[in-house]
């Protein structure tokens, strides 16, 4: 109580109210009792070695090392991947080391998980690497880059922009054919959309994402196929000269930037009907053959047979 006779009120958060009589209240400060806490030692005890930490991704039955993102469970080695996915042995030297990388193992692990969960994935397992089966890395002459496979069942078969025989060509492929006929008016018009005849002559028709969930374009971008494809293109650029790159649209142009002193790099808008620039005026097919002629090499027969 102060000299005026009024009760003393303490505003401290630790004050406790105590009633000492019926007539007067006095508030007394109760100082907090500080309890010394014992700090836990950092790290494991001396001489104790712990296993690497692991975690589980949602809905996944496999564990990963948190530092390297490497699957702890055993994975397919590169030879088994070549067998399961029907990859041409001609590509072994270029692909085998890359398929051993942790990110590549993660791609196949997630692919298998999706497949086992019942997801319908396009194209079929045996066609994902179909682009390797028509010519080896040393026979590649032209590179055409797409985005991801057609999401309609029966269309995709492992070659960018191409569809199986008997399937009506999609709009983008129709626009490619329109440009082809504009450049070669005497050519027999294509009667189907299968571009295997191009692939056999060394035209690499490569999507940056190799799989897709049926009916959902872009659904497998997250798997990491793009990194694998970029490494394939990088190694081709490093090991070869005189290739022709047809980069249609911003996506393809961002995927790879070949050295124009070593290769012919051609750019144009994407053949999609949504592009602002009509694809009909694209002269890449003629320009590629003119380039080969100057080098004394045979032209590509762009007929779709």
UniProtKB/Swiss-Prot annotation:
Taxonomy, superkingdom: Viruses
One of the record's GO cellular component terms: host cell nucleus
One GO BP annotation of this record: base-excision repair, AP site formation via deaminated base removal
PROSITE patterns on file: U_DNA_GLYCOSYLASE (PS00130)
Disulfide cysteine pairs (residue numbers): none
UniProt EC number: 3.2.2.27
Entries under InterPro entries matching the protein: UDG_fam1 (IPR002043), Ura-DNA_Glyclase_AS (IPR018085), Uracil-DNA_glycosylase-like (IPR005122), Uracil-DNA_glycosylase-like_sf (IPR036895)
Swiss-Prot/TrEMBL keywords: DNA damage, DNA repair, Host nucleus, Hydrolase
Function of the protein: Excises uracil residues from the DNA which can arise as a result of misincorporation of dUMP residues by DNA polymerase or deamination of cytosines. Therefore may reduce deleterious uracil incorporation into the viral genome, particularly in terminally differentiated cells which lack DNA repair enzymes.
Similarity annotation: Belongs to the uracil-DNA glycosylase (UDG) superfamily. UNG family.
NCBIfam families: PRK05254.1-1, PRK05254.1-2, PRK05254.1-5, ung
Name this polypeptide is given: Uracil-DNA glycosylase
Species this protein is from: Varicella-zoster virus (strain Oka vaccine)
